Amino acid sequence: MNKSNFFLLLAVCVSAFSVVMQQNQYRLNFTALDKAKKQEIALEQDYAQMRLQQARLANHEAIRAAAEKQNLHPPVSGNTFMVEHQR
């Protein structure tokens, strides 16, 4: 009986150690998931902000108003010239 008690004790210790390791791994995974969710929310907010900014910059009326405010006019052929790159 002494040998069987030793093996049972060893099995219980291995099982308990396994349970502790699994719980620790679960906690680590849960904190990593929580951190990833917070990062996802922050990235979604940044993306929404950039889309709003892109829509604002692409607004033709806003571009036209900014050009008029700065007294900018479309270029005419007399004001343009070609620059060629020589190798």
Curated annotation (Swiss-Prot):
The keyword S-adenosyl-L-methionine does not apply. Residues 31-71 form a coiled coil. It is found in: Cell inner membrane. It holds the Pfam family FtsL. Residues 24-87 are periplasmic. Residues 68-87 are annotated as: Disordered. It is a single-pass type II membrane protein. Its main location: membrane. Keywords: Cell cycle, Cell division, Cell inner membrane, Cell membrane, Coiled coil, Membrane, Transmembrane, Transmembrane helix. Signal peptide: none annotated. The chain crosses the membrane at residues 7-23. It comes from the Bacteria. Residues 1-6 are cytoplasmic. GO terms for biological process: FtsZ-dependent cytokinesis. GO terms for cellular component: cell division site; plasma membrane. Belongs to the FtsL family. Essential cell division protein. May link together the upstream cell division proteins, which are predominantly cytoplasmic, with the downstream cell division proteins, which are predominantly periplasmic. Part of a complex composed of FtsB, FtsL and FtsQ. This is Cell division protein FtsL. It comes from Neisseria gonorrhoeae (strain ATCC 700825 / FA 1090).
